[in-house]
Amino acid sequence: MSYVWETDNLVKEFTLSGGLFKPKHTVHAVQGVSLYQSPGETLGIVGESGCGKSTFGYTLMGLHQATSGSIYMNGRQIDPYVDRKAVHPVMQMVFQNPYASLNPRLTVNAILEEPLELDPKYTPRDRVIRVKEVLDQVGLNMSFGERDAHELSGGQRQSIGIARALIMQPQCIICDEPISALDVSIQVQIMTLLERLQEQHGISYLFISHDLNMVRYISHRMVVMYLGAVMEEGPALDLYEFPQHPYTRALTALNGPVIPHAPIGAPLKGDPPNPLDPPKGCLFSGRCPEAEGRCFVERPPLRDWADRRIACWHI
């Protein structure tokens, strides 16, 4: 099968200056992540704040340059940071904050036409037609095109953000916490819109969120990240109802038991380690109630287990 995108051992590090006469420090934001996405699939990535899930999405999109590893789109290896023209027909992004992601002084028409102006195949008339199409797809009429972004509500702004992502007809849309800044009632509307668009157009979503319930609801497959690495990956509902990795079980414990006798772990305690100095062994060893000997000195690989992959010495 040809995947929409695939990463092989992707690493993203940030170097921080230590100041005058002080050594530099390295933030290990993404640590050797190998993932893929099939056409029409929703892949959810979940984890605590600072786990690297958004950084992974930004690196995949080309907004950060990968430190090492490989990125493939439709089977072709590319560097999204350098070759952004190769990325945009394949992948677009919906950002977390609809108030910050749109220029408040531009009209909706101008915001949506801007990407089309960079493509010579679109004439001015074609651009008008395409803008009308995407507004209709997100449930807004043409009158919204004449309004400035600052005149819109949060839900309307995020709908425009989705329309902007749709305008170039990408295969995949990265949704980075797309509903976390919205009221609950608006969250439902946006989720319903995303599902409808996927049914109509076969779009793939990379859905990034800290909300395990939301990721489970919308995703076909789910990835659990911790301190920049994948802890567990598998079918979303199966992984949610029968978590295996101690970290995944701890996350599900926050939502209460789902199925009687399902393996639910103790709630998380303490804070994640400093990404400037990650543990030498398993990244979760310092907070894991099952950690012992080997866990503290040797990092477990991500191994196949039934229909999922898990990085844990106890499985």
What are these regions (language model features)?
Residues 148-152, 156:
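Conserved ABC ATPase signature
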Residues 20-24, 78-92, 118, 238-243, ...:
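ABC ATPase NBD coupling module
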